[in-house]
Amino acid sequence: LLVLLLTIVAATSVNAQKLHPLRKLQLAEMAISQLYVDTVNQQKLVEDAIRGMLKELDPHSLYSTAKETKALNEPLNGSFDGIGVQFSMVEDTLLIIQPVSKGPSEKVGILAGDRIITVADTAISGVKMERSEIMRRLRGPRGSKIKLGIKRRGVDELLYFNVTRAKIPVYSVDAYYMIRPRVGYIRIGSFGATTYAEFMKAVDTLQTQGMRDLIIDLQENGGGYLQAAVKIIEEFLQKNDLIVYTEGRAQRRMEYRATGKGRLTKGKVYVLVNEYSASAAEILAGAMQDQDRGTIIGRRSFGKGLVQRPIDFEDGSMIRLTIAHYYTPSGRCIQKPYAKGDQEDYAMDIEKRFKHGELYSADSIHFADSLKYQTLRRHRTVYGGGGIMPDVFVPLDTTQFTLLHRQIAARSLIINATLRYVDQHRQELKSRYTAFDDFYNNYTVPQSMTDSIFAEAERLKLKAYSKEECDKTLPMLKVQLKALIARDIWDMNEYYRIMNEQNRIVQKAVEIATK
């Protein structure tokens, strides 16, 4: 075998110019596997080779293992099988924030504030178990049972519950409510399998409450399924209006057009984006802008306009290969420029925008004449070159989230303080504030809570800590704490109702919508 391999390798070196590139790769893998001085992991060797090839193409072509593929797809699939709880880890213990409404845990009597101590008679509390391992133990096939040992405040002994795992929904519409009379607000966190149905349910609810105009919040929306975005856009456009088209070297132009069956062709629409709005979110914003159907408010979006085709392998792993570009109806390419193989420079783009002042001033952004396009109805000037440039620019406000605020958030001081506080005062808060509006109007975060956070920041010797920085941080910290407490008592809808009153992009949309 050794002689044979040496002969093959020798022949390869002599006939290198005639050798097919794929054959060269096969021979290299064979030689390493059979001749290398130490034992090698053949699977990892192949996976690294695939990743190496894709790395030289573009920033979004990628390879994922079976485990990674499942993790990538799960948030977009609309559901998973599990016990149905929202939880957070507090001092090595799983604290239940909320059981999913009508989910398997709620049905057997598990409550918000309960702590899961054992799973199938195995301790998961106080053993420094990885979060991923805890989730693996809690999840399982639909219909299977799991025994949970629960510690409940005020009860000395452990309580045991047998929970039957079930299909647990994963929602992509984070919040919807009437933000002002006649003006509805819907926040879409991502575009998944159930996003369109969730969106239309929100629309139906808001219309019964008097909605005429709509704010669609796509801030921090990283994208997802193209078809989910297309179906939502169709609701706003006339028959045969172009939504988006794709085109690539080996892919002919493919157009997506409105069917003309939309229910939202009247009323004003405001689409909110920022530098983290990407992909399907940019397709929605670009179509609404180019068709003059909506006003785009915020900051230039991320600029991810590459079409990926999934190529599945038998072991569950996958390649997502870029096969085309997305173009808005006016012909703008959404994808921002990149150098092949230089993913580090691409990853630094947002930081570059920050340093160059683009996030603070629209005047710092300069477009060449070749990047100017016209909208299809009013013939307004819009710009290509990567991302969607808003019609109304809203600068980033660095005074809201100070450096100290970011540092204490990164250390989980804010979320941990909230969890401890709600755990201690849950029943008191529920009894005192039976309705969210009462909480919204009358609740004030206690000074002891913010004092304890700043004291911990001082103890940890955070670099940004100072009395002056604490004073600057306090107003927004109190807003965030109030919003997190509302989330833990009610849900994400109430969280955004509080946070949005301080969100400059949302407030600019409200200002324009109520003129």
Where would I find each of the regions flagged by the language model?
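Bacterial Sec-dependent N-terminal signal peptides
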Residues: L1-L19
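Cleft-lining beta-strand/loop regions that shape enzyme active-site pockets
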Residues: N15-P21, L25, E29-Q42, T65, ...
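Amphipathic alpha-helical interaction segments
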Residues: L27, K44-D48, G52, K231, ...
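Extended, small/polar residue-biased N-terminal targeting/export presequences
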Residues: Y36-I97, G143-A175, M499-V510, K515
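Structural motif
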Residues: G113-R115
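Polar, glycine-rich mid-to-C-terminal structural blocks
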Residues: A280, D292, R299, G303-L371
